[in-house]
């Protein structure tokens, strides 16, 4: 009976630690993803140009598309 009790306690501790590890992983992913700015945030802060604005490179446009020296919508 004592061996069964010890075995159950060990199993409970292992399951508890596994649950803690899995709980931390999504939080780390959320922190990583939240550091990225949305297109609207980048535009609002002036880091990229909006639609129909003069451009010379794709990276200047929020959409990432510079066609005919003007930023595309999408």
Swiss-Prot record:
Keyword Ubl conjugation among record annotations: no
Pfam families: Conotoxin
Tissue distribution of the protein: Expressed by the venom duct.
Disulfide bridge partners, by residue number: 48-62, 55-66, 61-71
Principal subcellular localisation of the protein: secreted
MF terms (GO), sorted A to Z: ion channel inhibitor activity; toxin activity
Keywords, sorted A to Z: Disulfide bond, Knottin, Neurotoxin, Secreted, Signal, Toxin
InterPro entries registered for this protein in UniProt: Conotoxin
Positions annotated as propeptide: 20-46
Keyword Flavoprotein included in the entry's annotation: no
One GO location term (cellular component): extracellular region
Top-level taxonomic group: Eukaryota
Record localization: Secreted
Any coiled-coil regions, as ranges: none
Cleaved signal peptide residues: 1-19
Family designation: Belongs to the conotoxin O2 superfamily.
Domain remark in the UniProt entry: The presence of a 'disulfide through disulfide knot' structurally defines this protein as a knottin.
Protein's UniProt name: Conotoxin VnMEKL-0221
Source organism: Conus ventricosus
